[in-house]
Amino acid sequence: MSGVGGPALKLGVIGLGRAFGLMLPTFAGDRRVSLVAATDTREAARRRFAADFGGQAYATAEELCADPAVDAIYVATPHQFHAQHALLAARHGKHLLIEKPLALTLEDCAAITEAARAAKVHLVVGHSHSFDAPVQRLRALVASGVYGAVRMINAINYTDYLYRPRRLEELDTAQGGGAVYNQAAHQVDVVRFVAGGEVTSVRAVTGAWDRARPTEGAYAALLTFAGGAFASLTYNGYGHFDSDEWQGWIGEMGQQKLPGTAAPRKVFASQSEEAAFKNARNYGGENYDPGIAAPPVAHNHFGTLLVSCERADLRALPNGVMIYENGVARLDALPPPSVPRSEVIDELYRAVVDGVAPLHDGAWAMATMEIVFAMLRSAREGCDVALSHQVALA
C-alpha cells in the first residue's frame, strides 16, 4: 500500500446508505483515510456517524462540502443525485471518490469530469470490480505478453440481485434502477480493464420478467474491442441459480458461504414496507450489521471471468488466477486481503497525496457508462450501437 506512513486523507461522506455500508470495512481498516464528516437525510445515520467516528454530522451536503477540514468527498447517494453532489464538491475544491455508476447521462458524466478538471481536483470512480486484486493480477499477466494478446472474454454472474430489498426508484430504470445500471457497470469495467479499454460496438438484449419489479433483471451483451477482441457478458439477478457455486462458495464480498443456504425471498405487503425494511438494515438503522468483525476469507469477485489469450486461458478466482496452458492448470495464488477493497484507497491516496493520475477517472468511467447506455439502447432498438467516447487503458 502506498503512503502507509504518510498523512491520513480526511474523507467526508455524502450518503450513509448501502454503498457506504459496503465500503465501511475499508474505511475503518485502512489508516490512510480518516472519516471526519458526513451527511445523510436520515438523522439516525448522522447520529451514529458522530458516535462511531467523532466526526461532524451535517444536515446538508452544502455544509459538508464547505468544511475546510475535508480533503475529499465520497459520493454515495442514489444514482440520480451523483451529478448534483459531485458538482457541488468540485466547486468547493474537494477531491472526489464517486460510487459507480458515475451518472445517468453522458452529459452529466462529461459535466462531472470537466468540473473536476477545472477545479484541479482528482476524481476516482469506484468501487467497481475492476479494482479486485485477482482482476488486477490477471491484467498484469496479460500485460506481461507471456500469453499473447487477449482474444475473447466471458463474464458470467447469477445472483438474487432483483429480490434484495429495494426502494421504489431502484426498480425504475429511468432513475438508475435495474441490473444494467447497477451490475453491468461492474462487468463492463472489468472486461475493459482486461482487454485494454477501447470498445467499438455493443449488441445487447435485456430481460424484465417480473411485472411486480418492472426493471431489467437480466442481460446479455457482446462487446467488440478496437484490437479485434470481443467479450460476452451475461447477468441474471432472478435468484434461482447462484454462480458463487463456481467460485468455491465464496460470495461477492469475499465471504465464505454454505451451499444451499440462500435466504428465502422475503414478501412485503407494500413498497413502503420494503423500503423501511431496507432502511433498517442500512447504516444507522436498527438492524444494521457492520460486517467488520469477520474479515473476508478471499477477495471480492463478480462471478466467472474467463479470458482467452493466444497461448493460454486465464480465469480470475477469489484467491488468485488460474492459468490453463498446454494442458496444464496452475493457480497463481493471492493471499487473502487484510483490508477489503484497499485497492480503491491505493488509487485515491496515490492521486491526492502522491499526485499520480488515477486510472478510474472521469474519462474512464464515462467510457464505461457509454457502453451501459448503449446496452439499453441496443436492447430497446434491436441494433448494434457504435461508440465514440472510449478511452484506452493508460
Residue map of PLM features:
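N-terminal Rossmann-like dinucleotide-binding module
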Residues: 1-53
